[in-house]
Regions:
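Alpha-helix C-terminal capping segments
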Residues: 49-57, 102, 277-282
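Short beta-strand scaffold segments in enzyme catalytic cores
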Residues: 49, 97-101, 108, 241-245
C-alpha cells in the first residue's frame, strides 16, 4: 500500500530508432548513414520515469506489442522503479516506434503508434479501479478513494480513451494532469475532469489561439485554458520557465534553473513527472 498516494500514468511507450545522414535520400535512392541509436521513449513512459526518479510510487498504464521492443521498454521502466503490472502485451499489434532521420541539424520523424492506440477507455478505467483497490487499499465504491494521488495523461494515445480515462480518474479522486502533447483538443465534457492542464507555448497556441510571449498574452492564454473547464493551468516556456495564475488572477512566473543545456529531449515530460511527484509531497502549485 502506498502511504502518500501514487502517480498513475496512462500514456505512450515508444522505441525511438534514429540514424544520421548527410542528405535525405530521394525516392528509390539509398544513402549511407551513421550514428544509429535506439532509445526508449514515448511521453507517457518518459513522465513515469521522471516521477519515479523523484521518489513517487509510480504505475504505468499502457500497451506494447509482444516483441523485442516491448520487452525492452518494460524492462527499462522497471529498472527505473516504475510498476508495469498494468502494461498490456498485445499479440495483435506491434510496439509503437518513432523512426528519426537526422540530417544537417534537422530531423524528420515517422511515428507509428502501434499498441499505444490499442487500449480503450474502459481498459484504463479498469486498471485505475484495480489500483485504487490494491495499491491504495481502498474500496472503489467510496467517494474519492484516490484522494492524494495523481493521474497523468497526454495526447499520444487514443483521444477518446484519454478523455474517458480522465473522467474516471477524476471521479475516483485522483488529481488529474493533462499534458496536451502533441496538441489535441479534448471533448468538451472531459475538460471539467482536468484538474491541471499543462501545455507548452506551441500547444497553448493551438488550443487557445494565443501565443504566450509576454505578461498580457500569458494571462489571456491561461484564462482561455481555464475557460475550457480545467481547474488550473500551467504553461511551460522553455528557457523562460513556466507561468500560472495566482488565486487573485495575478500572473506567477517560475524561472528556469540556470544550467548548461546539453539536450532538451523529454524536458517537458520530465517537468510533468516532477510536478506530479511534488504534488504527492503536498507542495502548492
Amino acid at each position: 500500500m502506498a502511504d502518500r498516494g501514487i502517480v498513475a500514468v496512462f500514456g505512450s511507450m515508444n522505441m525511438d530508432l534514429s540514424v544520421a545522414c548527410e542528405r535525405i535520400p530521394r525516392a528509390g535512392e539509398t544513402v549511407g548513414g551513421s550514428g544509429f541509436i535506439t532509445n526508449a521513449g514515448g511521453k507517457g513512459a518518459n513522465q513515469a520515469v521522471a516521477a519515479a526518479r523523484m521518489g513517487a510510487c509510480t504505475h504505468m498504464i499502457g500497451a506494447v506489442g509482444r516483441d523485442a521492443f516491448g520487452a525492452s521498454l518494460v524492462a527499462g521502466l522497471q529498472d527505473a522503479g516504475v510498476d508495469c503490472d498494468f502494461v498490456v502485451h498485445r499479440d495483435d499489434v506491434e510496439t509503437g516506434t518513432a523512426t528519426i532521420i537526422r540530417c544537417e541539424g534537422d530531423n524528420r520523424i515517422v511515428l507509428s503508434p502501434g499498441a499505444n492506440h490499442a487500449l480503450a477507455g474502459e481498459d484504463v478505467a479498469r486498471a485505475l479501479r484495480r489500483l485504487v483497490a490494491d495499491e491504495l487499499d481502498s474500496d472503489a465504491s467510496e467517494i474519492a478513494p484516490a484522494a492524494g494521488s495523481v493521474f497523468i495523461a497526454q495526447g499520444e494515445c487514443d483521444l477518446a480513451a484519454t478523455a474517458e480515462a480522465l473522467v474516471c480518474a477524476h471521479g475516483l479522486g485522483f488529481y488529474t494532469v493533462f499534458n496536451p502533447a502533441p496538441a489535441c483538443e479534448l471533448p468538451a465534457e472531459a475538460w471539467p475532469a482536468v484538474d491541471l492542464v499543462c501545455p507548452n507555448e506551441t500547444e497553448c497556441q493551438v488550443l487557445t489561439g494565443i501565443l504566450p510571449t509576454d505578461d498580457v498574452s500569458c494571462i489571456a492564454a491561461l484564462k482561455a485554458l481555464l475557460d475550457k473547464g480545467a481547474g488550473a493551468a500551467v504553461i511551460t516556456l522553455g528557457g523562460a520557465g513556466s507561468v500560472t495564475l495566482g488565486d487573485d488572477g495575478e500572473l506567477l512566473r517560475m524561472p528556469a534553473l540556470s544550467s548548461t543545456v546539453v539536450d532538451t529531449t523529454a524536458a517537458g515530460d520530465t517537468f510533468i513527472g516532477a510536478l506530479a511527484a511534488a504534488r504527492l509531497e503536498g507542495l502548492p502549485l
